[in-house]
Each structure stands twice: as C-alpha cells, then as structure tokens.
Amino acid sequence: MTNTDTRDVEATLAQIDRLVRRGCEAVRVAVPDMAAAKALRALRDGSPVPLIADIHFDYRLALAALEAGLEGLRINPGNIGPREHVDRVVDAAKANDAVIRVGVNSGSVEKHLLQKYGGPCVEAMVESALSHVRMLEDRGFYDTKISLKSSSVLDTIAAYRLLAKSCDYPLHIGVTEAGGL
C-alpha cells in the first residue's frame, strides 16, 4: 500500500514504481475523500500494475474508484454503511469486473457484534466477515477475498484459522502499519 497523499499523482506514481521494482504485483491506494478519488483515473492510467482502492466510511468513494477503472476495492464491514450502499458497490464491482476484499479490523467490528460478544474478539471478526460476504453472495458476487486483522497477532492467527474452517475464499494476509519504503 502506498503511504503518499493519493491526491499527489506524481508522488504516488513514483512510489508505485518503486513498489513494482521491488516485486509488487498490485498496489493499494488510500481513498479518504473525493479529492483523492478524482486522482484515481490518472493513477490508473500511469500504473503498470492493478490498483486497489482502500475505502472507509463512504461508499461513494468505492463507486468513484470503480468508475476510474481500478481493479479492486478493500471495504470494511464496520464502516462501509448500510446494506443498500453495499449493494450499489457490489453491482458496480460486477459491472467493472473488479474484485472486493472484505477487510475486517478488530477495532472497527460492527456495534451489534461487539454487544453480542462483549467486545472485539476472534468470533466477532469472523462473523463480521462471513455476514458481509453473504451480502455480496446475495447479489451474485463471488470475486471476493477476505482479510482479518487484530492488534494481537495471536487473535489474528486464531481468526484466520476459524475463518478457514468456514469458507473457501482466498485469504489476504497482511501486516498493519508495517511502514513504507
């Protein structure tokens, strides 16, 4: 993932180039606002590898990323919004042959799951991921991968083990806040 200001097309493309030279085959870029979303077309046109939009809070940013031609999205069930927003994103992803990564973080698990389990835990993360994947499947969308992250490495491992028993989707294993190049 880039750590540049996505709105700075020149700096972001330079970082993408450095990542590609080090072997990256796809690069994720943050899309925190519409100004960043407006830069995505230029990034897509200038990138030699597929780009994935990291989306939080505003489903319209996901729609803008898909309209700009990005190949994938990372969405967080804990903050993407209600079902009707997810449905719009899924329909746009299908229309654009894009992949969706359902990325669950223990720190942003949905409130009803926090209440059910008494706080963030392995089971809450897995239930969040699986219920969100079902929303995608309900719309006939299966180009999905899943990630689970906790500040506890042991909880992250346990969550992936539990998730792997429950589905056959590809699992995206990453390190949060790993730093830049």
Task: State the predicted function of each range.
Residues 1-2, 25-29, 51-55, 73-75, ...:
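Hydrophobic faces of well-ordered beta-strands that scaffold small-molecule active sites
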Residues 105, 113-181:
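Catalytic alpha/beta core domains of metabolic enzymes, predominantly
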Residues 11-19, 28-68:
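N-terminal active-site wall of soluble small-molecule enzyme domains
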Residues 49, 60-101:
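Hydrophobic or amphipathic alpha-helical targeting/insertion segments
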Residues 1-4, 38-41, 99-118:
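N-terminal small/glycine-rich loop or linker at the start of catalytic domains
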Residues 1-14, 30-32, 49-57, 78, ...:
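Active-site mouth loops of central-metabolism enzymes
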Residues 33-55, 88-100, 131, 160-171:
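Alpha-helix-loop-beta-strand connector modules within alpha/beta enzyme cores
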